[in-house]
């Protein structure tokens, strides 16, 4: 910031993915949210993600080209979700929430659904990967987020990303 080093990235492992059970869903099924939901519904299973968490619903807004980011001043945030495509995104989220094959839930709910066999796909971060792999065994898979339909147009959902930083002491002689 302002040409000064305050920290550098140590990891970039705080994104999220689509985890799925290959015994229920094929690689092609999970490319589209519409197909994923139809196949999950036909199998009597659920697709899960948290809709009450801006971290995860960002994926819909980012797919529409909207942003929530740090302002140029490095202090304030900028969010343009209220622009024209934002209404389409909000409608797509509302439409998803009414699907019989969809269930909103936090990670603990998703883990419970995977372990209990009711969940065949979920959007979450790396912290549920072990549970999904253990529960689904050879049928475990993970991939990028699916496309979703916004006002009749397919858009690619996008993951947020987070970074762990190592801070730098500006007073040290080693900088």
Model-derived regions, located:
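Short helices/loops that flank or line small-molecule/ion binding pockets
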Residues: 38-42, 95, 108-122, 131
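Glycine-centered hinge/linker elements that transmit conformational signals in sensory
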Residues: 75-106
């Amino acid at each position: 910031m302002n040409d000064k080093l305050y920290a550098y990235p140590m990891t970039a492992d705080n994104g999220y993915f689509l985890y799925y059970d290959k015994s229920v869903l094929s690689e092609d099924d999970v490319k589209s949210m519409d197909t994923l939901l139809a196949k999950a519904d036909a199998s009597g299973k659920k697709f899960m993600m948290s809709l009450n968490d801006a971290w995860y619903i960002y994926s819909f807004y980012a797919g529409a080209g909207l942003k929530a980011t740090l302002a140029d001043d490095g202090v304030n945030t900028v969010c343009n979700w209220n622009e024209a495509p934002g209404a389409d995104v909000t409608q797509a989220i509302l439409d998803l929430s009414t699907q019989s094959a969809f269930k909103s839930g936090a990670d603990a709910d998703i883990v419970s659904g995977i372990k209990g066999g009711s969940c065949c796909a979920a959007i979450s971060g790396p912290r549920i990967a072990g549970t999904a792999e253990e529960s689904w065994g050879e049928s475990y898979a993970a991939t990028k987020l699916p496309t979703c339909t916004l006002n009749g147009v397919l858009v690619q959902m996008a993951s947020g990303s987070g970074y762990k930083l190592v801070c730098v002491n500006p007073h040290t002689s080693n900088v």
